[in-house]
From Swiss-Prot:
The gene is panB. Its EC number is 2.1.2.11. Pfam families: Pantoate_transf. NCBIfam families: panB, PRK00311.1. The active site is at E181 (proton acceptor). Keywords: Cytoplasm, Magnesium, Metal-binding, Pantothenate biosynthesis, Transferase. It catalyses: 3-methyl-2-oxobutanoate + (6R)-5,10-methylene-5,6,7,8-tetrahydrofolate + H2O = 2-dehydropantoate + (6S)-5,6,7,8-tetrahydrofolate. It comes from Buchnera aphidicola subsp. Acyrthosiphon pisum (strain APS). This is 3-methyl-2-oxobutanoate hydroxymethyltransferase. GO terms for biological process: pantothenate biosynthetic process. HAMAP family: PanB. Binds 1 Mg(2+) ion per subunit. Belongs to the PanB family.
Length: 263
């Protein structure tokens, strides 16, 4: 696979070519995903739960993300890598710049931050320094206490309008990509069509430019109850490779997510 760039992802949006993304945290899985043709990998702070065994993403530190980014880059040299800035690692511009440098040096193409209007100044400073930025709105796990738990966001009209306004403001301020998590399908469609940057959905219906899943959910190895928007692709396949290929196919052909995976 040739190196994936932000320009290529933007062209896919223009040409309405959907793409599949996935989380990964180590060399072996990132190499497998890359060999299957996954173009985008997120080194997510979800590792706090899937790798470290915590009950939330909040304990994850910047050093954890840097370590796992290095491992993933070795396994996926040509894949577009997005790395999370974890909780309280970007509380002001100085801290954001310092920690972004750590992550980019570790091999990421892009950093991701959760939040809306309060991030504008930080986004502008990073963008002025030519750093690629992915925004993340809707259900933002780093703020699940404030949100009252892991709930669908944007169901009410005023909440939906707020998310639309935030998405437009984030793009205007300099983000290069946006993740929408757990919002109604119609709202995600409207936001996706309103932005010129690629929009990736998780639990937000099929009308975004791309889809992302946590690898453990996709492979059916998450213990306990999983979110309703996830799908166990391994249960329908006889190998991990075939499960990933099925995931890619279903995303590219708008089969997944179906209505039962959407809100």
């Amino acid at each position: 696979m040739e190196s994936i760039t932000i320009s290529q992802l933007k062209n896919w949006k223009i040409n309405k070519k959907k793409f599949a993304a996935i989380t990964a945290y180590d060399f072996s899985f990132s190499r497998l995903f890359s060999n299957c043709g996954i173009p985008v990998i997120l080194i997510g702070d979800s590792l706090g739960m899937t790798i470290q065994g915590h009950t939330s993403t909040l304990p994850v530190k910047i050093e954890d993300i840097a370590y796992h980014t290095k491992a993933v880059r070795k396994g996926a040299p040509n894949t577009f890598l997005i790395s999370d800035l974890p909780f309280m690692s970007y509380y002001d511009t100085k801290q954001a710049l310092k920690n972004t440098a750590k992550i980019i040096r570790s091999g990421a193409n892009m950093i991701k931050m959760e939040g809306g209007k309060w991030l504008i100044e930080i986004i502008r400073e990073l963008s002025n320094r030519l750093i690629l930025i992915c925004g993340h709105i809707g259900l933002i796990p780093q703020s699940f206490h404030y949100l009252g738990g892991y709930k669908v966001q944007g169901r009410k009209e005023n909440d939906a309008n707020k998310l639309i306004d935030e998405a437009l403001l984030l793009e205007e301020s300099g983000i290069n990509m946006l993740i929408l998590e757990c919002i109604p399908e119609k709202l995600a469609k409207k936001i996706t069509e309103s932005l010129s940057i690629p929009v990736i959905g998780i639990g937000s219906g099929k009308n975004t430019d791309g889809q992302i899943l946590v690898m453990h959910d996709l492979l059916g190895i998450t213990e306990g109850k999983t979110p309703s928007f996830t799908k166990n692709f391994l249960s329908e396949s006889d190998s991990i490779q075939k499960a990933i290929q099925k995931y890619i196919y279903e995303v590219e052909h708008s089969i997944y997510p179906s209505k039962k995976h959407s809100f």
